[in-house]
Amino acid sequence: MSFSERLLAAWYQGHPALALLRPLEALYRRVANGRRADFLSGRKPAYRAPLPVLVVGNITVGGTGKTPMILWMIEHCRARGLRVGVISRGYGARPPTTPWRVRAEQDAAEAGDEPLMIVRRSGVPLMIDPDRPRALQALLAEEQLDLVLCDDGLQHYRLARDLELVLIDAARGLGNGRCLPAGPLREPAERLESVDALLYNGADEDPDGGYAFRLQPTALINLQSGERRPLEHFPAGQEVHALAGIGNPQRFFRTLEALHWRAIPHAFPDHATYTAAELAFSPPLPLLMTEKDAVKCRAFAAADWWYLAVDAVPSPAFVAWFDARLEHLLAR
């Protein structure tokens, strides 16, 4: 287990040694609260776009299902006839310059794994830049849009926003409830009181003050050929190597278990890069991975490498709330 994995386990499962980090946590909280106050008070300016901006983000470190939820929002808005764009930091990307327009034919090293996954799945106009206002301005210079989704960026207060949606893993919650480095929170838990909606990944029903959504496996996609097969392509009891380089790899492994496959887990750090030699696992079995990992492995994939396609399925109550908010924002 790597240091980052041990730290995540301590944050979410508890460890007495974390008490030693509380002085640093207190400093982190003061800085985070002060920075937000600077923008809310107007002491520091925020860029206000000429169209609605919806931020989809996390308050915790670790995966929450954000990318599938963004893909759902893209398709849902398009079904209403809306022109949607996306901006992202492009974590881990090394583009020739910024801002950088992500296109499907690029590779993950250039575009970032999550932005490339979004573009390949949806074809949405997407611009990456650590400077979110600059990314948005560049996107608007190229596209006529009705609204923009900001992938992450909850803490990027230089970008004014019209709606804040925060995703939380229902099983892990807020961990020990403490801020970095003593816990997994990027901002104090009180920050959740000011967001527009909380979405709980994996909740069985809408919790008090929030909405449930789940990730629904839909198909197996072959990395080499692009062939789409039903989940029944792997029968119950099928043994596979399972690769997950995401913020919460155990959720992926649990999904495979729920599908009655016998997975040999191989967890890697979030946004990890791979080589064919690293993934030559023994014994020789089909390799099953996340879609996010697949965008980094397609160039050297073997014939029996597959990814599990999943779709976000939000609760009907959230869909109704989201539609009402869209109508309000677009009428202004």
UniProtKB/Swiss-Prot annotation:
Record keywords, A-Z: ATP-binding, Kinase, Lipid A biosynthesis, Lipid biosynthesis, Lipid metabolism, Nucleotide-binding, Transferase
Pathway as given in its UniProt record: Glycolipid biosynthesis; lipid IV(A) biosynthesis; lipid IV(A) from (3R)-3-hydroxytetradecanoyl-[acyl-carrier-protein] and UDP-N-acetyl-alpha-D-glucosamine: step 6/6
GO molecular-function terms, A-Z: ATP binding; tetraacyldisaccharide 4'-kinase activity
GO BP, sorted A to Z: lipid A biosynthetic process; lipopolysaccharide core region biosynthetic process
A cellular component term, taken from the record's GO annotations: plasma membrane
Keyword ATP-binding: yes
Disulfides per UniProt: none
Main function: Transfers the gamma-phosphate of ATP to the 4'-position of a tetraacyldisaccharide 1-phosphate intermediate (termed DS-1-P) to form tetraacyldisaccharide 1,4'-bis-phosphate (lipid IVA).
Family of this protein: Belongs to the LpxK family.
Protein name, as recorded: Tetraacyldisaccharide 4'-kinase
Lineage: Bacteria, Pseudomonadati, Pseudomonadota, Gammaproteobacteria, Pseudomonadales
